[in-house]
């Protein structure tokens, strides 16, 4: 059976090699006659422009694609091995976004030179790594704490990047294409800098081979075998962070390869660590090589697109196709080394107090604000004048925060994975892509089509996830991988459209950032009605949400029909996410963090967890919307970005508090 399972991906890999070789041959032949290849490779004639392009552009581009692809496959295995999570990749600990933030700052400051950008990328990645290690150190760098700290710090850096883009859109236009990954080369300098750095990374990885193997076991077993677990994790993750920063500096952010290559290596039968490291590096090099040759062909027949976009568009369908054949997927137990507050009693009193606090926040957001003369408390006629402007956006923020938080609770309980959230399922990105696509297809003012276009995008995404995950027995982790594949593909497509320079993208940039600016009374009423219906259904799923985190075997033992239950919960979470996304755009924080905040406050039983998460999500977004209107008055910051700035410090405080 295992041989038959491994045969299909092996044939697929061979097919990809043949296609990549054929495309390379065709692209090189179009650029230069085959009779001149040898001369152009070794000693190009400076009077023949085709030979110069062949030597200084095409060949270095081929070499850099192989080097970067191999490096991404290598660091993907490192992250997945150390964190024991199949969803871990170079962006998991915030490495890529930290490096990108460093380079964004150097771009704004107009600091010249390749060494300046390389130093900025390394500095950004290392600062993020130090913050993550500092948060998780008190818990002996447990995988769950590292993942959560890395995710929220990554969100924080991403929010800063997005904020800089909103206020410096024209100045950072060139960053859009680079952010999605570009392998364009003008000499051999990039290759000459990168290959010795990668070789050093490979040598250090081989030195860490035994500790890395033991880190794939349970923490207790690894310690009993004599491994200094915290030190080993620190060394392995530091190595992965440095390699990732070097790759980001070289070509920008190329997603998906770090996730896909290790999974395909495992499917090919590479169970032991060393063969998996080697095979994942080869697969990563092959995928990036193929993607870049497709781009060279597209540039000639259509237009230039970014490498990261094509990589995601190739990798996502491949992963969806291969998912049913992936047998063993596991994630770390969310309770490993995870001390949380004692279970809270008197839940009703806490819920009432939270409701009162939320009501007070709404009143303050409605009445307290700034105008041309300074701070003022609006009342009477002034409040009546302000209500049509403030009421819709405050209610939109409240409803969206509640729905995203409840959706996050459902998804995390359904999958048992601490990285699970509405945006990981790809539904938010699918809805956003539907809206942006409609903007490009419909002439004139297309915002009237926002709701149907976004709903269709979310529905198509959900359908693809259900088909891909259902073919393999509807495993929760297959579902997460399918969602992550689609989310990566949609995000890369959105970034590619941003890089196109089309002025219409500026119209939706704030909406994508989670802005309540365009909320209307009619939209808020529709959202409120849908929210009430969906929240009324949620308590009916209480038994399922209580039993599913105990595992599939336990659920079957008590008579639960797993597949229909998982489909029903997925549909509920998808409807909550899509409705919230249509209202204020694809947020990237509340659905992930609100359930964790409620849990760390001591609410772990199903209904208390859901209720407190909903209150936390609503309060967070209402406060974020108010801050977004007031902090830089009269300018505004989207609530989605502000919720990240507000929520991340509190979440990190809770993580640190647990480790004392």
Language model regions located:
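Alpha-helical transmembrane segments in inner-membrane proteins
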Residues: 2-660
């Amino acid at each position: 059976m295992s041989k038959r399972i491994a045969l299909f991906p092996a044939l697929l890999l061979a097919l990809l090699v043949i296609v990549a070789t054929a495309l390379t041959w065709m692209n090189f032949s179009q650029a230069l006659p085959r009779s001149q290849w040898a001369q152009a490779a070794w000693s190009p004639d400076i009077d023949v422009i085709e030979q110069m392009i062949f030597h200084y552009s095409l060949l270095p581009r081929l070499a850099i694609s192989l080097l970067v692809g191999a490096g991404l496959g290598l660091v993907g295995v490192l992250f997945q091995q150390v964190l024991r999570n199949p969803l871990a990749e170079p962006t998991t600990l915030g490495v890529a976004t930290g490096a990108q933030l460093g380079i964004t700052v150097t771009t704004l400051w107009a600091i010249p030179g390749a060494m300046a950008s390389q130093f900025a990328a390394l500095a950004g990645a290392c600062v993020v790594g130090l913050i993550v290690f500092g948060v998780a150190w008190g818990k002996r760098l447990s995988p769950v704490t590292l993942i959560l700290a890395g995710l929220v710090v990554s969100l924080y850096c991403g929010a800063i990047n997005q904020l800089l883009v909103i206020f410096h859109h024209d100045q950072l236009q060139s960053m859009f294409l680079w952010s999605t990954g570009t392998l364009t080369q003008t000499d051999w300098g990039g290759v000459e800098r990168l290959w010795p750095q990668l070789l050093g990374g490979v040598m250090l990885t081989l030195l860490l081979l035994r500790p890395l193997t033991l880190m794939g076991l349970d923490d207790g077993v690894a310690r009993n075998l004599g491994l200094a677990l915290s030190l080993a994790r620190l060394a392995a993750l530091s190595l992965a962070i440095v390699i990732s920063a070097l790759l980001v500096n070289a070509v920008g952010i190329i997603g998906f390869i770090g996730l896909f290559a290790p999974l395909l290596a495992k499917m090919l039968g590479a169970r032991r660590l060393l063969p998996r490291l080697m095979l994942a590096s080869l697969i990563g090099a092959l995928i990036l090589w193929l993607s870049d040759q497709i781009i060279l062909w597209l540039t000639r027949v259509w237009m230039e697109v970014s490498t990261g976009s094509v990589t995601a568009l190739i990798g996502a369908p491949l992963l969806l196709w291969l998912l049913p054949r992936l047998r063993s997927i596991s994630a770390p137990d969310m309770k490993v080394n995870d001390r949380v507050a004692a279970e809270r009693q008197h839940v009703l009193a806490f819920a009432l107090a939270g409701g009162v606090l939320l009501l007070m926040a709404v009143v303050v957001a409605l009445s307290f604000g700034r105008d041309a003369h300074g701070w003022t408390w609006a009342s009477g006629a002034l409040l009546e004048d302000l209500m049509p402007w403030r009421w819709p956006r405050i209610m939109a923020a409240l409803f969206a925060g509640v729905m995203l938080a409840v959706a996050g609770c459902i998804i995390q309980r359904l999958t048992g994975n601490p990285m699970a959230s509405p945006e990981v399922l790809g539904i938010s990105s699918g809805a956003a892509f539907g809206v942006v696509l409609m903007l490009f297809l419909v002439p004139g003012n297309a915002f009237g089509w926002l709701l149907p276009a976004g709903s269709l995008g979310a529905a198509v995404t959900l359908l693809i996830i259900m088909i891909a995950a259902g073919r393999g027995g509807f495993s929760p982790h297959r579902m997460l991988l399918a969602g992550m594949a689609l989310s990566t593909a949609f995000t890369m497509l959105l970034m590619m459209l941003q890089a196109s320079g089309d002025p219409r993208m500026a119209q939706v940039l704030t909406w994508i950032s989670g802005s309540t600016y365009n909320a209307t009374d009619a939209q808020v009423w529709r959202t409120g009605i849908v929210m009430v219906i969906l929240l009324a259904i949620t308590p009916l799923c209480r038994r399922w949400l209580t039993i599913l985190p105990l595992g599939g075997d336990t659920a079957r033992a008590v008579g639960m029909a797993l597949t229909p239950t998982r489909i029903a919960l997925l549909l509920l979470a998808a409807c909550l996410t899509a409705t919230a996304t249509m209202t204020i755009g694809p947020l990237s924080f509340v659905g992930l963090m609100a359930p964790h905040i409620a849990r760390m406050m001591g609410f772990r039983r199903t209904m208390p967890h859901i209720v407190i998460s909903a209150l936390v999500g609503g309060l967070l977004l209402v406060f974020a919307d108010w801050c977004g209107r007031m902090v830089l008055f009269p300018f505004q910051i989207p609530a989605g970005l502000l919720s990240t700035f507000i929520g991340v410090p509190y979440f990190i405080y809770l993580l640190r508090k647990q480790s004392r």
